[in-house]
Design a protein with these regions (language model features):
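Class I SAM-dependent methyltransferase SAM/SAH-binding core
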Residues: 106-150
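Conserved class I S-adenosyl-L-methionine
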Residues: 96-105
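A short glycine-rich, Lys/Arg-flanked "PGG" loop and its adjoining helix->strand segment in the class I
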Residues: 175-189
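A short acidic, Gly/Pro-enriched loop at the edge of an enzyme's catalytic core
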Residues: 151-162
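Substrate-binding/catalytic lobe of Class I Rossmann-like enzymes that use SAM or dcSAM, i.e.
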Residues: 202-291
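A short SAM/SAH-binding and catalytic strip from SAM-dependent methyltransferases
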Residues: 161-173
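N-terminal auxiliary segments of SAM/dcSAM-dependent transferases
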Residues: 2-53
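Conserved alpha-helix/loop element of class I SAM-dependent methyltransferases that forms part
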Residues: 78-96
Length: 308
């Protein structure tokens, strides 16, 4: 077998990238890929549904926070996700007006709300999620948009309840509050289940808790219910972190070692890239390190009521 040389790799890539014939082929393959995106997404959802049925995409809620990660099964994760959704469900009362599920994912919470007699509208910018939910949970109304871009005039004072389940962290806080005030009915409920930063950590996902608290009160929201559930989502983080440490990083190190053994010169060329990849995975593992999470963040379930 001919040895692979860096010069040959560069010539081949540039030749295929710049030659008109190959460039046209590239465009055709790109179009084919776009047409296959739907089938790929269906396959991913099917796999996820087989692993964790229920269509939930959140951390879950464990009644026993001290359960060791080695004793947690996929069934336990599934049940924890259902308990989390039921925790949110208990905060709802108004069945006369629509519920808006912001960042509805694949529709697990939508399904639970429909089963309990609520009229639900799901919001997501993802066209595949829209298609999936419309086929699997047809009673749900759907809005394909980012929350920041929702048509306020069409939904002004429309919803009796708005739910942000692990979606508020992706929306600028001032923008979210302003929109909720316009599309939520007076005396309506805004349910937020998400994690918040408790200090100035290097990792910036999640809003600052003190800032959130100050701004919602200034905006005219009363706190109807407030519950910290950090310890109850701890087992999920510990479970994911355990598998990352026991399987993810060792597998990467094994593959890099095999690559170095078979292609030492290529390994030398890509060494900095491989080191950066390892560093990237380390940082991602830190995001689900339960001890770091508890040090820097708190997970809250808070129900707010909009006053006149």
């Amino acid at each position: 077998m001919k040895k692979i040389k860096a010069r040959w790799v560069a010539q081949s890539v540039l030749g295929r990238g710049l030659h008109p014939k190959h460039f046209l082929r590239y465009l055709k393959l790109s179009k084919k890929k776009q047409s296959n995106d739907r089938h790929e997404f269906d396959a991913q959802l099917k796999l996820y549904a087989q692993i964790l049925p229920g269509d939930f995409l959140h951390y879950g809620y464990f009644d026993q926070p001290d359960v060791p990660p080695e004793r947690i099964s996929l069934h336990d994760i599934q049940q924890a996700q259902l308990r989390y959704a039921q925790l949110i469900l208990r905060q709802l009362e108004n069945r006369d007006n629509e519920v808006l599920d912001v960042g509805c994912g694949t529709g697990g919470l939508i399904n639970l709300l429909i089963q309990n007699g609520f009229k639900v509208t799901g919001l997501t910018p993802d066209r595949f999620q829209i298609q999936y939910i419309s086929e699997k949970y047809p009673p749900a109304q759907l809005i394909r948009a980012k929350f920041q871009n929702i048509d306020i005039d069409s939904y002004r004072k429309h919803f009796g309840t708005i739910i942000n389940s692990e979606s508020l962290q992706y929306i600028a806080l001032d923008k979210a509050i302003a929109i909720v005030k316009q599309i939520l009915k007076t005396d309506g409920r805004w349910i937020v289940a998400d994690y918040f930063r408790t200090g100035q950590s290097m990792e910036k996902s999640g809003h600052l808790w003190d800032e959130f608290h100050t701004k919602i009160k200034a905006a005219g929201f009363n706190i109807f219910h407030e519950q910290e559930i950090t310890q109850n989502i701890y087992p999920t983080l510990a479970y994911v972190h355990m598998w990352g440490e026991k399987l993810g990083l060792p597998l990467l190190e094994y593959l890099v070692g095999k690559f170095k053994q078979k292609h030492p010169r290529l390994h030398y060329i890509f060494n900095d890239v491989l080191l950066e990849l390892h560093s990237y995975l380390d940082k991602k593992l830190d995001l689900v390190n339960p001890e770091i999470f508890i040090r820097d963040k708190k997970y809250m379930l808070i129900t707010l009521q909009l006053t006149a």
